[in-house]
Curated annotation (Swiss-Prot):
Protein name stated in the entry: Cytotoxin homolog Clbp-3
Main location group: secreted
Organism of origin: Naja atra (Chinese cobra)
SUPFAM superfamilies membership: Snake toxin-like (SSF57302)
Pfam families to which the protein is assigned, alphabetical: Toxin_cobra-type
Length: 82
């Protein structure tokens, strides 16, 4: 019985990502993504305001970058949301 319990605990640990990290797209195309470094739990996408449908940059961040007069930044906190 102890062996079965230990086996279940090990399987649970292996199946769960205990050190969960965010996954964010990291290219203008949404086909490629990266696992973010520890501490960077925000995905962001930067678009030029004149061409909002074309992302300029997608990446991970610890804090959301600021938008400016020329670029719009969209931040989110779920996997591949950017």
């Amino acid at each position: 019985m102890k062996t079965l319990l230990l086996t279940l605990v090990v399987v649970t640990i292996v199946c769960l990502d205990l050190g969960y990290t965010r996954k964010c797209h990291n290219s203008p195309l949404s086909l490629v993504y990266q696992t973010c470094p520890i501490g960077q739990n925000i995905c962001f996408k930067i678009n030029v305001k004149e061409a909002p449908s074309i992302p300029v940059k997608r990446a991970c961040a610890a804090t959301c970058p600021k938008s400016s007069a020329l670029v719009k930044v969209v931040c989110c906190k779920t996997d591949k949301c950017n």
